[in-house]
Amino acid sequence: MSLQPRDVVIVDYARTPMGRSKNGCYRNVRADDLSADLITGLLARNAALDPAQIDDMIWGCVMQRGEQGFNVARNILLRAGLPHTVPAQTVNRLCGSSMSALHTAAANIMAGLGDVYLVGGVEHMGHIDMNQHVDPNPALGHSVAQAAGSMGLTAEYLSLLHGITREAMDEFGARSHRKAAEATEQGKFAREIIARIGHDETGAPTLIKHDETIRPDTTVEALSKLKPAFNPKGGTVTAGTSSQITDGASSMLVMSAAKAAELGLTPIAKIRSMALAGVDPSIMGYGPVPATQKALANAGLSIEDIDVVELNEAFAAQALPVLKDLNLLDAMEDKVNLYGGAIALGHPFGCSGTRITGTLLSVMQDKDATLGVSTMCIGLGQGITTIVERV
């Protein structure tokens, strides 16, 4: 493939191992330190880039308070020891924050506003409770169902609309853990994980090399015994078929093709298309469908042209309707979340967008795939999609 000078290319990507939020390996590690150490590792393996050449650092984070407040991106940049001349901004599109950071960087490169961007995101859900200090306007109830603020209830509603059974959800949840465990055992995450110091059960410092969240022994039978998590009377969504509450950070180094060539850095993929969409907040999990359809149309592609898909697993009850309406259910075993997803790895809000896009690139390299889609739903009714093409 021949690249044009202003094509947007991903040169490298990395993430921390995912940690459980409740008494997990990062319980004594701050969100800004998680990110700063990750950035240090990513830049160290791209030594041809002088960090002073970074035009902007764009970092996703949802719960922007405490250690994640006061423009955490700038705090991370300073903590990582990057030149003070490099600017930084924190973005918040809820679950889609770091993918939105990627899109902003890509749009800037296409427009000629810059050549080098460091993007990513973080969420320490163990330190910053997602349910505290949230004060939705009561007047929203005039135009939006009050239950739309409960992501679990929106997943319940979506599953009812699409006839998704409890059995199908449990099978999907078990698959996520099985695929993630297999990927770990086979070293498939080695490209993307940068090990870091955390703490073991006794509180002793230890090097965290793998995701703490995966449960290899998860079975459909075990999941079938769990009680509903959001609707105790007749509900089907359980903790076992929901994305885990976790701590983590992810990052990508994004450039114009011209700058990558100038620095002698080899691109992994180029951004082929990007799209956003809105949906009724009551079915917020459906957002990936219109977002992906829009991204495909913008690129002149069909879903059949796509080799690999990473869909953020907010809930099995949400993922299955999306796959159904994108005509991916029959192709799931060959194309979708082949290294597991957020049910096994977790969904640290600000981190997940570049996390799933990085994992997509890992899968594409292993499968020698050409075209890939990363997509996710977003709380309160949005969807975001990125289409990448390997170079």
Swiss-Prot record:
PROSITE patterns associated with the record: THIOLASE_1, THIOLASE_2
State the GO CC annotations. cytoplasm
What's the gene?
fadA
Q: Which InterPro entries match?
A: FadA (IPR012805), Thiolase (IPR002155), Thiolase-like (IPR016039), Thiolase-like_sf_Thiolase (IPR050215), Thiolase_acyl_enz_int_AS (IPR020615), Thiolase_C (IPR020617), Thiolase_CS (IPR020613), Thiolase_N (IPR020616)
Superkingdom: Bacteria
Q: Which organism is it from?
A: Saccharophagus degradans (strain 2-40 / ATCC 43961 / DSM 17024)
Catalysis: reaction(s): an acyl-CoA + acetyl-CoA = a 3-oxoacyl-CoA + CoA
Q: What class of enzyme is it?
A: transferase
Q: Which family does it belong to?
A: Belongs to the thiolase-like superfamily. Thiolase family.
Q: What is its main location?
A: cytoplasm
What is the name of the protein in this document? 3-ketoacyl-CoA thiolase
